[in-house]
Amino acid sequence: MPPSLEQMLKEMVERDGADLFLSVGTRPTVRGGKGIEPIIDHVLADEDVLAYAAQIMNDHQRQVFFETNEMNMAFEIAGIGRFRVSIFQQKGHVGIVMRQVKTIVPTVDELGLPGIFKQLINIPRGLILVTGATGSGKSTTLAAMVDHRNSTLPGHIITLEDPIEFVHQHKKSVINQREIGLDTEDYHTGLRNVLRQAPDVILIGEIRDAETMEHALMYAETGHLVLSTLHSLNANQTLERITQFFPLEMEPNIHRQLANVLRAIISQRLVPRADKSGRVAVVEIMIASPRVRELVSKGNVGEIKITMEQSTQDGMQTFDQHLLQLFNRGIVSREEALRAADSVGDLNLRMQGLTTGTSSLA
């Protein structure tokens, strides 16, 4: 007899797992701090996964899935939790991935993020981007930053999300969260109307195309704080990705716009903790200092990493600098730090210097 959806999700939550994978021909599997492992000894059949999909989706979502073979949504079971769901076709079968969403919004301090995140989120205007691969914790970091703003400053925060993951409460700010496909048709429609809602802060769940990027730049230029995410691995790749949205002849203008409005690019990866208790965020921080703005305006993104390495006094850091700090504090192992490093050889040398007492990066 196949396990119930409730049974599997409860098991994932109890294990503090991140993702539940439901695929035909294999057992229900969870990704957690110990890696990926099956949780129930039952090989899923077509009818099992189809039944789970039918339970998760409403009539409208089923219609969209029938037309596109894709559906992304939020799903909640009382007493168990809230989940981000992706339902898709693979080799002619339905597949489901369910990611656990923490309904209690974490704080910047609880996530162990640098204190400069609190300063950045409280600036009055500009563009802040949080980047990283899928599953790197971008949404969690943004939620913590928004909660800090919500807790400390009055104003109006509007979010456009696909789907809503963390549910915020009104605190010092009024916060309105709009879900794509439920509260507005798509990002473009929501963004075309957002200024009518008199926001101080606009959160765009993800920038996927030129039109969304244009709105982000324009609203940052007109005095709003704009927050969003991109699927890019670091600051250099993020800047290159943004320019690739647009025709080549527009690049100089895009570089000038970015130099004017960009306030920070935060890139992150999740690395297993040395004590096997879970994963820790490793963050690269690029702050739009005068030197960075000059490089961005000229399109000289290749020099930005060196500038970050030399600007720790401004709150900047590279991935490898943060990995070195975490290794020094015993939070990540040498093996995992080197696996996540941008420059394995350089980080290894710095670690050897650190372990022999040589001065290193703070």
Please place each PLM-identified region on the residue numbering:
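Short, flexible helix-loop junctions that flank or precede catalytic/ligand sites
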Residues: 1-362
